Amino acid sequence: MIGAGAIALEFASMWNAAGSKVTLLIRKDRVLSAWDRRAGTTLTRELKRHGVNIITRASVTHVDTGANLGATVHYTREGQDGEQSVWGEIALVAIGRDPITDPAWGVTIDDHGHVATDAYGRTDKPGVWAVGDVTAGHALAHRAFEQGIVIAETIAGLNPKPVDEATVPQIVFSFPEAASVGLTVEQAQAREDLIEIKETNYPMLANARMLMRGTA
């Protein structure tokens, strides 16, 4: 499996729980590298503890597929010479999604293929608005709902606040699960408008659900 985001981790957890031998090839030193470091490091450790083989700092060079099911994934690793490979009955590539957009729509498309909008979802074509996966940012349904509300209120002549991207919650339904909302410590430290930054850790050993399930 190639990737270290939500889709890769959810499939890795599901197949691993079903008894399959799963190998995860990731480019960084931990999964969910865009999240808080502690969250990514902890989930990496727990996935390994549950039997998922995680190969870090790996760059896939090519994939060989046969006539039948099965694929050999070739990769190199940072700090190591030569190319290595791993074989599997199924190779899943989960390295992100691209929006399906077209310049023929008459709106500006950015370098990553997203429809360019202002903070209220307005494109540069009068009367045309954009929400959801075609816009830059988290490709999450609840974010799109909030964008839709902002657009509707703007059209109605109200004065809504733009969607605060930092408060959009994210969750990965892996085993164990991971959730995130707000700024990471690193992101907060990079902002000049924040004077004081505090971090609080809540141990899962104090969570009743985790204790009952034996996943604390």
Label for each model-derived stretch:
Residues 1, 56, 117, 130, ...:
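General beta-strand structural signal in soluble alpha/beta enzymes
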Residues 2-5, 35, 133:
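Glycine-rich Rossmann-fold phosphate-binding loop(s) that bind the pyrophosphate
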Residues 8-9:
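N-terminal Rossmann-fold NAD(P) dinucleotide-binding loop
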Residues 12-17:
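Gly/Ala-rich phosphate-binding loop of Rossmann-like dinucleotide-binding domains
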Residues 18-119, 195:
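A Rossmann-like FAD-binding core segment of flavoenzymes
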Residues 36, 49, 60-62, 71, ...:
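Mid-to-C-terminal Rossmann-like scaffold of FAD/NAD(P)H-dependent oxidoreductases
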Residues 65-66, 83-85, 122-123, 127, ...:
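Solvent-exposed alpha-helices and their adjacent loops that cap or buttress functional pockets
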Residues 85-159:
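FAD-site-proximal beta/loop scaffold in flavoenzymes
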